A protein has these predicted regions:
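A generic structural signal for short, non-catalytic loop/turn and secondary-structure boundary residues
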Residues: 1, 44, 94-96
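Short, extreme N-terminal segment that most often corresponds to the first beta-strand
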Residues: 1-21
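Ordered hydrophobic segments in well-structured contexts
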Residues: 5-8, 48-52, 89, 98-104
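Glycine-rich loops and low-complexity Gly/Arg-rich segments
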Residues: 32-33, 74-78, 126-130
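Ampiphathic alpha-helical segments that act as solvent-exposed interaction surfaces
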Residues: 81-86, 90-142
């Protein structure tokens, strides 16, 4: 089993990378992460993590996934973990369905690594439910 490591970077207000913060050791599910970084806003550090499908989807699936994916489930998970400030946005400019979750960064790196693994698992489970739900709906989207 191959493990993935993701370098957590910090960006400035102009979106320029200014610092390498840490390396997060993640399992195979890291394939669901498009990007993750820290950014300062209002004198606080925020984590932004973009989660997507781990592989390409067909055109009809793109729309169906957005229709059936429940961002609120992920937000509920984040809030249950103390991320009451968490927000989600859809990244329409991405090739595959992608959601960006943003919340205040307040953990030690080891705790963040565990948290990101759990978050990706919740996202992966939601996508699996979505794919089961849409598997016979191609005709509705063509």
């Amino acid at each position: 089993m191959n493990e993935f490591a993701i370098i957590l970077m910090k960006k400035d207000k102009e979106n320029v990378i200014i610092e390498e913060v840490s390396t997060l050791d993640l399992g195979l599910d890291a394939e669901y992460i498009n990007s993750i970084f820290i950014k300062d806003k209002d004198d606080k550090e925020y984590i932004s993590i973009q989660l997507s499908t781990k592989s390409g989807v067909e055109d009809w699936e793109y729309s169906a996934i957005y229709d059936y994916y429940e961002e609120d489930k992920i937000l509920e998970y984040l809030k249950s973990k103390g991320k009451t400030d968490a927000v989600v946005s859809i990244c329409e400019e991405e090739f595959n369905p992608t959601w960006e979750y943003t919340f205040i960064f307040s953990e030690e790196i080891e705790a963040l690594e565990l948290f990101v693994n759990e978050l990706v698992q919740v996202h992966k489970n939601e996508l699996q439910d979505v794919f089961l739900e849409i598997k016979d709906k191609e005709g509705e989207y063509l």
